[in-house]
Amino acid sequence: MSLEIVILAAGQGTRMRSALPKVLHPVAGNSMLGHVIHSARQLDPQRIHVVIGHGADVVRERLAADDLNFVLQDKQLGTGHATAQAVPFITADTVLILYGDVPLIEVETLQRLLKHVVPGQMGLLTVELDDPTGYGRIVRNADGKVAAIVEHKDASEAQRAITEGNTGILAVPANKLADWMSRLSNNNAQGEYYLTDVIEMAVSDGLLVATEQPHDPMEVQGANDRKQLAELERHYQLREGRRLMAQGVTLRDPARFDVRGEVSVGRDVLIDINVILEGRVIIEDDVVIGPNCVIKDSTLRKGAVIKANSHIDGAVMGEGSDAGPFARLRPGTVMGARAHVGNFVELKNAKMGDDAKAGHLAYLGDAVIGARSNIGAGAITCNYDGANKYQTTIGEDVFIGSNNSLIAPVTIGDGSNTAAGSTINQDVDKSQLAVARARQRNIDGWKRPVKIKKT
């Protein structure tokens, strides 16, 4: 069975009160439409058609990809009209219709739905709701089979009492969809072309409308305003928290934890409160992450420890290494096994060897630091001359004294020491002591200046 997917994403979202198209509003660091596209791709379709309207150029620019065919709906005349715009481009046997503002739909739910597309049958995703206000109602016949969908505004009082709602997500034979689109009418309270009308057409044509339901009603929840967007965000985060806990992670408080990307985890990981994981994050066994940390596009090897209020971005922390509190690792940083970065230390594009240490108050940019070397408090690699950046190379077993300025490009040989307060702008050979500071003078009879009174 060949598959193509149509995602309806043309709505304006006036209740968002935003210049940003509704489907581009973020949930967990990705746009709502981005989440839907991600789920769609996991179904391995031939092609994905995205129907766009309001803010079409912005949507196309943000999400352009080779497997996406953007189809313009000039006038927003309903979901049926939107779907019809994509029909001429469809060549597959089966079509799955999704919505760009329904980001939490699970791939497993869609796989179950697609299994219903067999000869003489189509699939419809419905949902049982305590309060179905606003949803189209699933009308069934005396045999319990789906007969039609009636939109809320067109429903009678008896029909509004039905608690089974239409999600709008359906899977249909492509040839049937093309026929149904040509027969749609806008003779209804809204004056729009409803996609839901195809259900009655399918029944009339003798097709069985088989239904599936999501395991969680929030899977099919859309967002029309900021409140609903926040509800989706919180539900997504709790869902991700449950997934990670099932894989061996202890979350101190799942309600105070955010995932904004893709995270893979090992066992016996401990994550404290107010931790944010962004982008692609790999966390191996026995990692401990303290409170109030942000970790982005990074790898944390087995047993790594991140202490409170640290920011890790584009870095690799080696096995048994630790950083923080208040540490910052910037892109390109690699810490070796058991390396230590303490409070108020910043590394950028720096390589630290095994057991190397920078305990506090240091900036190490564009640097290579050998194994077992120690960086004193207040040490800085002066890597930028206003136009270009240069590397500082520190060998193994080096001791860099406190308050050192290392003016790159410069190399400090293995086993060397630099004295506190030094400004090092020349290479230091192996096992040397470098002292580069003015000689102290003690001046007798010196008088402290007296403050001049203002007139």
Swiss-Prot record:
UniProt-annotated stretches for the region N-acetyltransferase: 248-455
Positions that bind acetyl-CoA: A377, N383, Y384, S402, A420, R437
Query: GO biological process: any one?
Result: lipid A biosynthetic process
List, alphabetically, the CDD domains matched: GT2_GlmU_N_bac, LbH_GlmU_C
Cite the Gene3D superfamilies for this sequence: Hexapeptide repeat proteins, Spore Coat Polysaccharide Biosynthesis Protein SpsA, Chain A
Q: What does this protein do?
A: Catalyzes the last two sequential reactions in the de novo biosynthetic pathway for UDP-N-acetylglucosamine (UDP-GlcNAc). The C-terminal domain catalyzes the transfer of acetyl group from acetyl coenzyme A to glucosamine-1-phosphate (GlcN-1-P) to produce N-acetylglucosamine-1-phosphate (GlcNAc-1-P), which is converted into UDP-GlcNAc by the transfer of uridine 5-monophosphate (from uridine 5-triphosphate), a reaction catalyzed by the N-terminal domain.
Q: What is this protein called?
A: Bifunctional protein GlmU
Source species of the chain:
Pseudomonas fluorescens (strain SBW25)
Encoded by which gene? glmU
